Amino acid sequence: MKNLDVSWDGIHDATGYLFSLAKSLSCTVKNSPWHAYAEDIVATSGFAFRMWVSADLCPSATSIWGFDGQKPWVESGGLSCEYAGRYWGQDHIEKEKRLEAIGNIKRSVDRGVPAISWDIGIPEWGLVTGYDNETETLATLSAAPPFERGTLPYEKLGMRELPLLSVLTITGENGKPQDEIFRDTCKMAVVHLDGGEWCDNAKGLEAYPALIRHFNELYNDEAAWNREYLLGNYGALKYYAWRYFEKNGHANHGNFAKISCGSHLRKRAFVGN
């Protein structure tokens, strides 16, 4: 068994509900030669700006999006990636994509970098930290408390509780200049604020009033955990947005508020001033 010594130590998650893919992405980059990107990548990939709320506050609604967007989004943040995935209704390519994903995982672990995978521990993202060709198993680390380590047979990758395959590996830096990363981050933030997602949930800026209604006229004691989860999830993500703009000199005084609300952000993204 080849297994990397990786933990969630040093990954900022003040609420305990940080989106598991963002948490896994930051941890993977932190445990790579490109660790300088570990905090920024949550924002520069666009995940820090994404919000959507279903009518019944279903926590699974946060996982309804195009998984194959991970590669171009992360590469927009300055890192090169490999991605292997499969959706429902693609059983005819299940084996092909699973073998591709396992190959990507092995190469990544051999480089000393964990892989990000869907359905690790619970139906959320987590890390693949190792592999064993003799037993044909993968070593895994869950992003959800109690952060259990486990093993997963090769044949079960992408075939567990929710049979979708999504494996992202980081392969290096792509040389993208920081000013271009900032400009493209602003563009992605605008798209997300405007609700540029293919799901039917309230999204972008519309997610705020949709969530607030569940604290007022739609208040229900039985939905207490759902409200806590969504607030914790998006609140933790917005920390990374704030940190990124702070580093780039746009979090002081009114500038960050303008960027957050979208008007100033649109100008910076599409006009340049």
Residue ranges and their predicted role:
Residues 2-92, 110, 116-123, 131-273:
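Cys-His-centered catalytic/binding microenvironment captured across papain-like cysteine peptidases
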Residues 89-107:
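Mixed-charge, Lys/Arg-rich low-complexity intrinsically disordered regions
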Residues 104, 114-115:
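Generic recognition of flexible, low-complexity loop/linker segments
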